Swiss-Prot record:
This is Tyrosine recombinase THA_404. Gene3D superfamilies: 1.10.150.130, Intergrase catalytic core. PANTHER family: INTEGRASE_RECOMBINASE PROTEIN MJ0367-RELATED, PHAGE INTEGRASE-RELATED. Belongs to the 'phage' integrase family. InterPro entries: CB (IPR044068), DNA_brk_join_enz (IPR011010), Integrase-like_cat_sf (IPR013762), Integrase_catalytic (IPR002104), Integrase_recombinase_N (IPR010998), Integrase_SAM-like_N (IPR004107), Tyrosine_recombinase_XerCD (IPR050090). It comes from Thermosipho africanus (strain TCF52B). One of its GO terms (molecular function) is DNA binding. Residues 1-86 form the Core-binding (CB) domain. Its main location: cytoplasm. Residues 107-281 form the Tyr recombinase domain.
Length: 283
């Protein structure tokens, strides 16, 4: 089993050009499936996949009932795996045929107000918490994913003109994110004082771990007395929502966020629509 999974992983990395996070997730999903089924690969049938997905949805695989997005990811993982096996001649019938993704209910993302963002960033002391303040500032002012922040390298920063180069992976073109004036002084001060060598936020020779940034964020939220469940992605949602509110074209927001599909970005239009409904309720 391990050999086939590693061959599959190499295929995803070098042919499909998937990101490291996707590789880890797909390998983990496939390993759980094969362990559950307990069959030789060429003996696996569609009913085995259906039984696994049923057990997964009941919480028998992970210990809790997963969201539709998690089930959909498992299906994507297994689709990729069996497509690879078929291309490689290891199987002749694909058990994933006619296996459909669950219908996912799209949830309007939570976001912070501009005042809450200011309070959050202002909760960090620039003299002895410059690292934390800079990291949280970039999550918002550059709309970064937590993985993008942690993997950010010193060579990805330009001050003239001011922008970040964000690696997109999956064979996609890197995106350039312009930096607003508010974040430039603090980023420049951090780079000048800390002088990071490879990664902007280093931990020895490696980059800082996402859990560390999450801990910084939670501390800032507590100090700012923000009564919302705030995660690193909340700042990215806030960045997109505020841009849409200010009248920025949705296609521009799509490029800034690095979304492949415009439909992914369009969820932020619903945030503005919801505001309208909330407004008329006050009449």
């Amino acid at each position: 089993m391990d050999k086939v999974i590693e061959m599959f992983s190499d295929y995803l990395a070098h042919v499909r050009r998937h990101s490291e996070n996707t590789l880890k997730a797909y390998k983990k999903d496939v390993r759980k499936f094969l362990t559950y089924v307990g069959k030789q690969i060429n003996n696996i049938e569609r009913k085995d996949v259906e039984e696994f997905l049923k057990a997964l949805s009941k919480g028998d695989i992970t210990g809790e009932s997963p969201r539709e997005t998690t089930i959909s990811r498992y299906i994507s993982s297994l689709n990729s795996f069996f497509n690879y096996l078929e291309l490689s001649g290891m199987i002749y019938e694909n058990p994933m045929e006619r296996i459909k993704h669950p219908r996912i209910r799209r949830k309007i993302p939570d976001f912070l107000t501009e005042d809450e963002v200011s309070s959050l960033i202002g909760a960090f002391n620039e003299e002895n918490e410059l690292r934390q303040k800079t990291a949280i500032s970039l999550l918002y002012y550059a709309g970064l994913r937590i993985s993008e922040l942690c993997n950010l390298r010193t060579t990805d920063i330009s001050f003239i003109p001011p922008f970040l180069r964000v690696e997109m992976g999956k064979g996609r073109k890197d995106r350039l994110v312009p930096l607003p004036d508010k974040v430039i002084p603090i980023l420049k001060k951090y780079i000048d004082l800390e002088n990071p060598k490879i990664f902007v936020f280093e931990n020895g020779k490696k980059h800082v771990h996402p859990s560390t940034v999450f801990r910084w964020l939670k501390e800032g939220v507590k100090r700012a007395n923000i009564k919302k469940d705030v995660h690193p992605h909340t700042l990215r949602h806030s960045y997109a929502t505020h841009l849409i509110r200010k009248g920025v074209n949705i296609k521009v927001v799509q490029e800034l966020l690095g979304h492949t599909n415009l439909s992914t970005t369009s969820i932020y239009l619903h945030v503005a629509d919801q505001e309208k409904f909330d407004a008329v309720k006050k009449l």
